[in-house]
């Protein structure tokens, strides 16, 4: 349960400014776009397969740590394919639980099979910190 026993939903905390990139973008290009937008992840959409994945700053750092060239490495070889999706109607507790269970820090938010947002651990903590304290 959220602090003070209040229930807030993913729609209350998610970002609706979503960075969407293609699978053939290089890691450097993805990192540059993420930096410019001040986001820690991007939704990777492959129009050929209608598939969706996610690339995070952690994925990029992992590749660089293994000595891979960010100018040559395509995003598609480093993204997460088995994306766990949230809905705007999930509670923040449900989102946090899914993140904990899956070991990740971002969830793509879908509504009617459309990407409508992204929620991160930071978004959840920020929303919880704004709740009034329990007396």
Specify the residue positions occupied by each region the protein language model found:
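Tandem CBS (Cystathionine beta-synthase) repeat/Bateman regulatory domains
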Residues: 1-135
């Amino acid at each position: 349960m959220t602090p003070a026993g209040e229930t807030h939903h993913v729609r209350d905390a998610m970002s609706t400014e979503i960075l969407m990139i293609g699978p053939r973008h290089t890691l450097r290009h993805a990192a540059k776009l993420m930096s410019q937008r001040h986001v820690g992840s991007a939704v990777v959409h492959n129009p050929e397969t209608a598939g969706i994945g996610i690339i995070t700053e952690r994925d990029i750092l992992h590749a660089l740590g293994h000595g891979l060239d960010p100018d040559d490495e395509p995003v598609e070889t480093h993204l997460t394919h088995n994306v766990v999706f949230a809905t705007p109607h999930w509670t923040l507790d449900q989102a946090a639980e899914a993140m904990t269970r899956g070991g990740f820090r971002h969830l793509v938010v879908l509504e009617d099979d459309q990407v409508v947002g992204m929620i991160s651990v930071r978004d959840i903590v920020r929303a919880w910190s704004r709740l009034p304290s329990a007396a």
